[in-house]
C-alpha cells in the first residue's frame, strides 16, 4: 500500500495506472476509521481495480474551531486498517497542501439549495466546505467511481447534484448505513459518548423506526409524528435537534407526487451529535407538507 501526502506524487501514480487502463475507485474520509468506512472500501473494490482512500480532516467544513481541534486523529491505526483491506493508495495531505493560500483565498464550490437547506441551515458553510474539498480531491484522484455512506444522506444528494452540474464523469455510489448490533449508526463521533450515553444512543434509531412504522401504517400527519418522536427522544435523555420528513429524491417538502420519503433525524447526546435517516416507501398519497418540528 502506497501512502502519499503530496499532490504531485499522487498524480504521478494515478497517471501510471491510467496508462495501464486501470479503473479507479475513491473513498474520501476524515480518518478515525470504523467498520462503516471499511464497508465503503469493500464496495469500492467491487467496482474497480484500484482503490484510493484519502484521509484529511477538512477545516473548511467545521463551523467551530473546537470541533476541528477535537476531531479524533488516528492515522497510524487508520493506515493499518486500510492496509488490511488491500487498499492500493492512501492520500494524507495536510491543510497546507490542500489550501496553500489559506481558506480565505480558496475558491469554493457551492450547490445552490441543497447547501443551505435542512442540515445546511443548521451548519452554515458546512456543505460548501464539503463540496469544495471533494471537488479538489476528485480533480486530484480522477476516479471512475466514488463511494459515500448513506448515513450522511443530504451530503450524498449534494455530491450527486454537484457531479451532475459540473459534468464530472464520476459515478457516485451510495452505500447503506452500517450499524452496531443495537442499531446505532456507526460514526466517528460515537467515540465522544460516555458509557451511559452509549447505552441510550440507540434510542435515535429505534425512534426513527417507530416513525417509519407510523408512515407505513398510513399516517400522513407528519408534523405530529415528528413531535411525538421528539418526545420519545427527550424521555430517553436525548436533546432533539432537527427532524424532518422529506421527499427522498429532492429533499423538498413531501408532495402528492412523492413516492419515497426520507426520515432525517438528529439529536444531541452529551458531546456527540447523532444523525440518522431511513427511506420509506409511501403506500398512499402523501401529505402536502412535512417540516421540521420544534425542538
From Swiss-Prot:
InterPro entries: Cyt_trans-like, Pantoate_ligase, Pantoate_ligase_C, Rossmann-like_a/b/a_fold
A molecular function (GO) term: ATP binding
GO cellular component terms, semicolon-separated: cytosol
Active-site residues per Swiss-Prot or TrEMBL entry: 37 (proton donor)
Reaction equation(s) it catalyzes: (R)-pantoate + beta-alanine + ATP = (R)-pantothenate + AMP + diphosphate + H(+)
Disulfide bonds: none
Residues the entry annotates as binding beta-alanine: 61
Keywords: ATP-binding, Cytoplasm, Ligase, Nucleotide-binding, Pantothenate biosynthesis
Binding site for (R)-pantoate: 61, 155
Residues that bind ATP: 30-37, 149-152, 178, 186-189
Keyword Ligase among record annotations: yes
Chain segments annotated as transmembrane: none
Top-level taxon of the source organism: Bacteria
Gene3D superfamilies with a match to the protein in the record: HUPs, Pantoate-beta-alanine ligase, C-terminal domain
Compartments it resides in: Cytoplasm
Function: Catalyzes the condensation of pantoate with beta-alanine in an ATP-dependent reaction via a pantoyl-adenylate intermediate.
Alphabetized NCBIfam families for the sequence: cyt_tran_rel, panC
Additional note from the record: The reaction proceeds by a bi uni uni bi ping pong mechanism.
Database matches in HAMAP family: PanC (MF_00158)
Protein known as: Pantothenate synthetase
Protein source organism: Photobacterium profundum (strain SS9)
Originating gene: panC
